[in-house]
Structure formats: structure tokens, C-alpha cells
């Protein structure tokens, strides 16, 4: 008889609990203002609540189609056509997923095989690397450096090889709050040309873009979209992160492979919530057009409130995150500083180094401004005392 528990050999031995979970738990423990994890402290549109209740009452409580409710896929196709001038096929090209993270995982799993190389840009969202590792891929990283975090396209081209199968981009970019320009999208296309590789474009903050020229999507590029997967998030757009509904748009052949993975991960997504979102997209198309101004005001509240502090605010072109240089305040590294900030000052933030594989020597932290104005001002008051 075995005396000790059977412990599996980990496929992800170097990973623990995500920094977002850690910092939110620390914030709760010390009753700190939580500007760490990226979720709003206000609710989404009342209309969504009403439509959800309506569809529940109408009996839409069984499995949805594996690819997503038809009404929602049609609404997504129409929205995409309006914004990017391209209408994906709502039957073959759009897949509704349990949040954007599932779409990212399913796409990586579908496209990456053992030994394939995948390129991403650091700092990068922490779900990319585990998905690549679980597929047996080899992650190649290109460092983006502050304060502007622009892509070095010569370095990118030099990293390409016959084994390169996928490049993962994220714009607007979490955590740096930068956005790609149309010139970047074109540079990507020129670099990959006719290579047999794909593009995974994480565009979950597509409607939270403050750049004058707007959001540059791969879906607006006729050549790139033929080999690209674009991922978006209703949770980010409608302040409903707990609904965990996202989607991906890709050509039919790529979507077919993504769906093979999706059907054995979650099979389908919450039916009444999908129908409520379809109603929302139809009834209020002006909603997402107003989102940049909505978050720009929140960004400016926090930036202006920190103007008299010793903290340096980096440019924010998109997302609902703000990078802060605290080098004038402390010599602690960013992980130590965030812990101290939470425990002693009462404001929780995210250290930027956790988004990087290589040592990150910069003293930068990330704050989330998807909060009520009173929350932002209270946090800024504490930070101004540093």
C-alpha cells in the first residue's frame, strides 16, 4: 500500500498562482485600495441585466451552439464590418468562447505543435507562455523597453526562422498601455510575407484606445487577416468581467481547428448571457464608440491627481492601465515595492517584472484605473504622501 500521496510531475513546474490573484488577496487582507487586478469596481449597463433576466425567464437556459449563439455571431460580424470594413462569415469565422483567455488558449493549442517557435513581445500577458509550453512550443521573446515600448522590427525579423509558426501581438497592450500603429501592422506583414506562419492578435482592449488614429486591427489588413486570429472580450468592453465571454475571428480553416479544441474545453458558453450581449450590440452600437472617452476621463482623473506626487506617470495610449515609475520614491525592486505599497500605504498595484521572462531592471508598476472616481482619488491621496 502506498504511504505517500501520488504527486503528478508538473507540466508547468515553474508556475504558481498568478500575480493578480496574489495581489488581490493581499489587498483584501490589508484592506488596501485594489488598483492591481484589471476589473472595474462599477457595474455594466443596466440594459444587459434586463436582457439577461428576460432570456432566462423565456427559457433560454440550455446549451447554446458550440460555436456560439447565432444572434451573437451575427451581431459580431456586423460590428466587425462597421468598424474594420470586413465582414467575417458568421457561420464559419466566429467562435464565442468562455472569455478571451480561452480563445487565446484554443488558438495556440490549435496552431502550435511540438518544436514550433512562437514569438511574443515582453512585457506580455501571462497566459501566453503556459499555453505555448503545454503545446510543446518554444517561446521566443522580444523585449520592449520603456518609456515608449515600441517594436524593433529589425530584431523581430532577425528572430524569424523556418520553425517560426506563430507571432502573438497585443494591442492596445497590457501592461504597457501602448498601441500599435498602422505602420506596425504593415511592418509585421512585410516581415512575415509568405512564410508559413500565423498571427494571434490579442485585441481585448480594442475599444479602449486613446490614440488619434485609433485601434489598428489585423482584421483591417486584407493580407494579414487571411492568416490571423483576432481575439476580443465582452467582459472588458461592457465592464462584466465575471461573465467571462469573449470571441475570436479567423478564416474558416483556422476556425475549424480552434473549434476542435474549444468543444473539448468548454463546448459552449452561457446561453442567456450570449443572447443578452447580442441584444446589446444591436440596441446600442454607440456604446463602444463612447468607451474611449469614458476611460480617458478616468485616466485623466488619476494622472492629474498624481501630478503633485513624486511618482512619474508614463504615457497611456490605451487599455485601462497606467504605468508608474517609482524610482524617485524607493530603491526596492518592483515586487518588493508592490508588497510594501499594499501593506504599508494601502494601495495594491502589479509589478511589471512579472510580465517578463528576462530580468526587468526598471522600477515600474501597473495601476488599473477602471474604478470609480472616488476610488481613484482615494488611492492618489495615499500615493501622493510617498
Language model regions located:
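N-terminal small-domain helix-loop-helix segment of the aminotransferase-like
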Residues: 2-99, 106, 280-283
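Conserved core segment of the aminotransferase class I/II
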Residues: 3, 220, 225-296, 300, ...
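PLP-dependent enzyme catalytic core of the Aspartate aminotransferase-like
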Residues: 78, 157-158, 331, 340-349, ...
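Conserved PLP-anchoring active-site segment centered on the Schiff-base-forming lysine
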Residues: 110-132
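A short helix-loop-beta submotif of the ANL/AMP-binding
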Residues: 134-140
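A short helix->loop->beta-strand "cap" motif at the edges of active sites that frequently abuts
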Residues: 137, 194-197, 225-226
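Active-site phosphate-binding strand-loop segment of PLP-dependent enzymes
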Residues: 144-213
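Conserved glycine-rich beta-strand-loop-beta hairpin in the small C-terminal domain of fold type I
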Residues: 278, 294-303, 313-326, 360
Amino acid at each position: 500500500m502506498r504511504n505517500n500521496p501520488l504527486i503528478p510531475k508538473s507540466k508547468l513546474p515553474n508556475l504558481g498562482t498568478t500575480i493578480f490573484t496574489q495581489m488581490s488577496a493581499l489587498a483584501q487582507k490589508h484592506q488596501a485600495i485594489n488598483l492591481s487586478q484589471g476589473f472595474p469596481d462599477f457595474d455594466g449597463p443596466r440594459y444587459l441585466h434586463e436582457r439577461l433576466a428576460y432570456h432566462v425567464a423565456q427559457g433560454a437556459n440550455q446549451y447554446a451552439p458550440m460555436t456560439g449563439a447565432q444572434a451573437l455571431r451575427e451581431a459580431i460580424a456586423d460590428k466587425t464590418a462597421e468598424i474594420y470594413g470586413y465582414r467575417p462569415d458568421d457561420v464559419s469565422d466566429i467562435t464565442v468562447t468562455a472569455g478571451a483567455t480561452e480563445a487565446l488558449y484554443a488558438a495556440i493549442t490549435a496552431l502550435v505543435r511540438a518544436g514550433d517557435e512562437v514569438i511574443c513581445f515582453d512585457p506580455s500577458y501571462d497566459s501566453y507562455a503556459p499555453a505555448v509550453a503545454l503545446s510543446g512550443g518554444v517561446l521566443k521573446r522580444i523585449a520592449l523597453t520603456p518609456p515608449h515600448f515600441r517594436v524593433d522590427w529589425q530584431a523581430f525579423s532577425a528572430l524569424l526562422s523556418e520553425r517560426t509558426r506563430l507571432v502573438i501581438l497585443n494591442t492596445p497592450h497590457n501592461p504597457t498601455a501602448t498601441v500599435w500603429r498602422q505602420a506596425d501592422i504593415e511592418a509585421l506583414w512585410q516581415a512575415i510575407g509568405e512564410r508559413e506562419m500565423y498571427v494571434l492578435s490579442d485585441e481585448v482592449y480594442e475599444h479602449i484606445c486613446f490614440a488619434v488614429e485609433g485601434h489598428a486591427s489585423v482584421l483591417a489588413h486584407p493580407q494579414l487577416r487571411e492568416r490571423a486570429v483576432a481575439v476580443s472580450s465582452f467582459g472588458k468592453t461592457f465592464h462584466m468581467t465575471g461573465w467571462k465571454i469573449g470571441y475570436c475571428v479567423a478564416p474558416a480553416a483556422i476556425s475549424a481547428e480552434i473549434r476542435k479544441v474549444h468543444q473539448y474545453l468548454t463546448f459552449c458558453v452561457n446561453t442567456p448571457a450570449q443572447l443578452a450581449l447580442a441584444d446589446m450590440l444591436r440596441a446600442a452600437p454607440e456604446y463602444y464608440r463612447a468607451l474611449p472617452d469614458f476611460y480617458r476621463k478616468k485616466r485623466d482623473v488619476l494622472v492629474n491627481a498624481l501630478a503633485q506626487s513624486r511618482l512619474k506617470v508614463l504615457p497611456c495610449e490605451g487599455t485601462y492601465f497606467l504605468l508608474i515609475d517609482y524610482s524617485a520614491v524607493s530603491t526596492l525592486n518592483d515586487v518588493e515595492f508592490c508588497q510594501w505599497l499594499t501593506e504599508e500605504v494601502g494601495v495594491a498595484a502589479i509589478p511589471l517584472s512579472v510580465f517578463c521572462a528576462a530580468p526587468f531592471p526598471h522600477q515600474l508598476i501597473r495601476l488599473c484605473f477602471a474604478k470609480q472616481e472616488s476610488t481613484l482619488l482615494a488611492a492618489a491621496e495615499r500615493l501622493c504622501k510617498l
